[in-house]
Structure formats: structure tokens, C-alpha cells
Curated annotation (Swiss-Prot):
<dbReference type="InterPro" id="IPR018254">
    <property type="entry name" value="Ribosomal_uL29_CS"/>
</dbReference>
<keyword id="KW-0687">Ribonucleoprotein</keyword>
<dbReference type="InterPro" id="IPR036049">
    <property type="entry name" value="Ribosomal_uL29_sf"/>
</dbReference>
<dbReference type="GO" id="GO:0006412">
    <property type="term" value="P:translation"/>
</dbReference>
<dbReference type="Pfam" id="PF00831">
    <property type="entry name" value="Ribosomal_L29"/>
</dbReference>
<protein>
    <recommendedName>
        <fullName>Large ribosomal subunit protein uL29</fullName>
    </recommendedName>
</protein>
<dbReference type="InterPro" id="IPR001854">
    <property type="entry name" value="Ribosomal_uL29"/>
</dbReference>
<keyword id="KW-0689">Ribosomal protein</keyword>
<comment type="similarity">
    <text>Belongs to the universal ribosomal protein uL29 family.</text>
</comment>
<dbReference type="GO" id="GO:0005840">
    <property type="term" value="C:ribosome"/>
</dbReference>
<dbReference type="GO" id="GO:0003735">
    <property type="term" value="F:structural constituent of ribosome"/>
</dbReference>
<dbReference type="GO" id="GO:1990904">
    <property type="term" value="C:ribonucleoprotein complex"/>
</dbReference>
Length: 62
């Protein structure tokens, strides 16, 4: 997701995306613990996306 797309989301959309991405991250970590996933960089990318969404949510909340 690009930065411009993140900035265009509403506060409610940001909250929903954060919850969805956290669930996705949990599933990825669990799948990687059982057997290595094909692209382990997905975990890092998802974690960074959550951070970007959280940062934008904080900026919009102020």
C-alpha cells in the first residue's frame, strides 16, 4: 500500500486495516513457525505496513 493511499483513508478505515493486518501478521508468524513460508519478507513488510497505518492514525487523531 502506497503512502498516498494510506493518507487517503479515513480514521475508521485505518482502524479496520490495522486490525486486519495484525491478524494477517499473526497468521504469517504462526505459519512460518510450523514450516518456513515461501517469502519470509512478507512478515517484515506486514509489520512495516502496520507501523505506517498506526502512524497515520495517530497523525489524524491529533
Amino acid at each position: 500500500m502506497k503512502t498516498a493511499e494510506i493518507k487517503g483513508l479515513s480514521v475508521e478505515d485505518l482502524k479496520q486495516r490495522i486490525v486486519a493486518e495484525k491478524e494477517n501478521l499473526h497468521k504469517l508468524k504462526f505459519a512460518h513457525a510450523i514450516s518456513p513460508i515461501e517469502n519470509p519478507m512478507k512478515i517484515s513488510h506486514t509489520r512495516k505496513l502496520i507501523a505506517q497505518l498506526s502512524t497515520e492514525l495517530t497523525a489524524k487523531s491529533k
